[in-house]
Amino acid sequence: MAFSGCQAPYLSPAVPFSGTIQGGLQDGFQITVNGAVLSCSGTRFAVDFQTGFSGNDIAFHFNPRFEDGGYVVCNTRQKGTWGPEERKMHMPFQKGMPFDLCFLVQSSDFKVMVNGSLFVQYFHRVPFHRVDTISVNGSVQLSYISFQNPRAVPVQPAFSTVPFSQPVCFPPRPRGRRQKPPSVRPANPAPITQTVIHTVQSASGQMFSQTPAIPPMMYPHPAYPMPFITTIPGGLYPSKSIILSGTVLPSAQRFHINLCSGSHIAFHMNPRFDENAVVRNTQINNSWGSEERSLPRKMPFVRGQSFSVWILCEAHCLKVAVDGQHVFEYYHRLRNLPTINKLEVGGDIQLTHVQT
């Protein structure tokens, strides 16, 4: 099966879940499953890479079991019959805790990373290119399932016509004096694990639809403290998206996500737990504009819990979703979108994942 580019993630899918892997698996393909193990029900969960939705042909069955001290079963099912189990007598997951589970498809095997560390490799028993479906079931809650094919090289259109995606890099923290918004507290420094992935094509079950644009880029899993700063090559343009995931610290007061244009902050998103608000604003020439605070429902972030933020750029505004739910729109105050080319994240969170 020919792979037609990367596909957009499934956001906050209900479990049990089955979804299409567009174009099927290819050598070098990477799938990330982000979520949390439920603390009060069930003793198992499973991630299956299979052909079709019947479950009779599963190329790779990854099955953590919180029994007998905890272990993980790997297996293959062909025509309804299971093969011999491979067991890893170690449990990298904890009940009630978030996880980042990454599957890397290689010519000979699947390599499985849990929270940034290599956990197991599973040698193919059937041709992996037959796989066109991913399923998740059991005692987990999902934040997202994302996809990346680092070998896909779609053509980059002009700004006026391009739908989205952009690679990311890690420049040094910029110098200079910038007026900070009142009472934005610094982050508690903590090492983190991050994966940077491109996901750029529409699929059913997502909030926003997308099509390929710029070649995806993949980075290793460095550990570094907050704040996190990176360039956005090409800047913003209609249909470009940015996705960030992390965990709010238990004692969090505030954190912020900034999209910057030179010394200006085109978009400042500032969840404030001390005010039970999500403040949005723009800073031009070191001067803050009028705040926007309205929300359609309660505060979407919770202390001590994981989150996923999706920022979608459109011609007139930014659309923002939290955990798969649309929460607000922010109309552009700086309209030269391609100059908005830097992302800054800081405050009382642990950042775990960035997709651009």
Swiss-Prot record:
Pfam families: Gal-bind_lectin (PF00337). GO terms for biological process: negative regulation of CD4-positive, alpha-beta T cell proliferation; negative regulation of type II interferon production; positive regulation of gene expression. It comes from the Eukaryota. InterPro entries: ConA-like_dom_sf, Galectin-like, Galectin_CRD. A beta-D-galactoside 1 binds at residues 82-88. GO terms for cellular component: cytosol; nucleus. Keywords: Lectin, Repeat. Binds galactosides. This is Galectin-9C. It comes from Homo sapiens (Human). The gene is LGALS9C.
